[in-house]
Amino acid sequence: MAEYHSISDLVKLSINNKQELWQVVLTGQAHDKLMSERDVFAQMKKMYQAMKSADEQYDQQLRSPSKMAGGDGYKMRIYNESGRNICGDFIGVVMEKALKMGESNACMKRIVAAPTAGSCGVIPAVLLSYEKCFGVTEDECVKALLIAAGIGAVIAENASIAGAAGGCQAEIGSASAMAAAGLAYMQGADSEGCANALALALKSMLGLTCDPVCGLVEVPCICLLYTSP
C-alpha cells in the first residue's frame, strides 16, 4: 500500500498535505495501481453504480436455497412507507437497503463485496440512503466510498476483514467502520472526525463471533447488516 499503513498515517497525510481524506486515498490508489487519479475515481464510480444496480434489481419473490432468506427487504419498505418506523426516515431506508442487499447475496444475485460478500449490505445501504434522503451528488458518495476503501485497506493490512478468520467483528465490524468514516465525511467531518467515527463503530462491533445457522451467510448475518450501520 502506498504511503499509509494505519489510520494515523491517513489522518497525518490529510493534515500535512492539506487534502481531504478521500484525496489521500485516491492518490494512494493511483500510485498502487499505476493509474491516473481520474481513472481511479471513474473505477470507484462504476463500483458505486454497481451497488445502485444491485439495490434496484432486488426481487422480493426470491428465496435462498435454504428458504431462510428473502422477502424481508420488501417488508421493511412497506413498513417504512407506513410512517410508523420510530427510527426515522434515513435509518429506515438504511435498514431496508441493507436487508435487500444481504438477501440478494443469499439468493445468488449480483452484489458488491464491501469489503466481503457477507458484509455487502452495510456500505451500500448507508451511502445509497444518504444520497436518496439528503440529495447529495453521486460524486460525493463516490468520495465517501473512497474513504471507506482506504479504511478497509488499512484494516485488511493490519488485521482481517474475513469473518472465518476474525469473527463477525472483522467482517461486519470492518464494514461498519468503513461506512461510518464515509458518512462522517458527508456530514462535514474532517479527517480526525472520520477516524473517530470509524473507531466508535468498530468498538461497538467487538466480540461478534462467526457462528451462522447451518454454516450459511444468512442467519444471523443478514440481520447484522441492518443493525450495524
What is the meaning of each model-derived region?
Residues G88-N105, E140-A159, L202-D211:
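Acidic-glycine-rich active-site phosphate/pyrophosphate-binding loop
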Residues A106-A114, Y130, S160-A164:
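Short acidic, glycine/Ser/Thr-rich loop/turn "cap" segments at secondary-structure junctions
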Residues Y226-P229:
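Conserved small/polar residues in nucleotide/adenosyl-binding loops
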Residues P124-G135, L183-G188:
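Alpha-helical support elements that line or immediately flank enzyme active sites
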Residues N158-A170, S174, A180-C223:
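Hydrophobic alpha-helical bundle architecture
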Residues I111-V126, E171-A175:
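Conserved phosphate/anionic-ligand binding catalytic regions in large, soluble enzymes, centered on
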Residues C87, G135-C141, G188-C194:
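Structural helix-adjacent loops and short alpha-helical linkers that scaffold large soluble proteins
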Residues M1-K109:
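Generic N-terminal targeting/processing segments that precede catalytic cores or assembly contacts
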